[in-house]
Design a protein with these regions (language model features):
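Core dinuclear metal-dependent hydrolase active-site scaffold
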Residues: 1-35, 86-118
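Active-site metal-binding motif and surrounding structural segment of the metallo-beta-lactamase
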Residues: 26-71
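Short, conserved acidic/polar surface loops in the N-terminal third of protein domains
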Residues: 52-53, 74-75, 116-118
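Short hydrophobic/aromatic-enriched beta-strand-loop microsegments
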Residues: 61-65, 83-92
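Short, aromatic/basic amphipathic alpha-helical patches
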Residues: 71-87
Length: 118
């Protein structure tokens, strides 16, 4: 496993079978490994945790906090295609997601009232 800090709240986590990108909004991404699925997480819509440019990445799935709404207006502003929107999952409450075979994302209860996938 390799973890790269990408400024403020951003991290790139490279596991043998998948790459995870968390809250990237600033700085350059290192070269992504070809052929390895990418999951992109944005915990919430604050500009220091989310930028619409994530949707230009060739990600297997985008896991978004519940305040990142894929309304028709936002989709138009962000240039989001139907194909990309179909790969977006909104996390909130206690739902689990299985964006890839063998990968399960399960929100855990927060320890504070700060922003979260909850």
């Amino acid at each position: 496993m390799r973890v790269t800090f990408l400024e403020h709240s951003g991290f790139l986590v490279e596991l043998p079978s998948v790459t995870l990108l968390f809250d990237w909004w600033k700085g350059e991404l290192p070269a992504l490994r070809p052929g390895v699925p990418l999951l992109v997480f944005s915990s919430h819509r604050h500009e220091d945790h989310f930028k619409p440019e994530i949707f230009s990445l060739d990600a297997a799935a985008f896991l978004l906090g519940k305040d990142i709404r894929l309304s028709p207006r936002n989709r138009a502003r962000w240039g989001l295609s139907d194909e990309t929107a179909a790969r977006c999952l909104t996390l909130g409450g206690s739902e689990t997601a299985a964006p890839l075979s063998g990968v399960t994302v399960e929100p855990c209860p927060p320890r504070t009232r700060a922003w979260r996938f909850w």
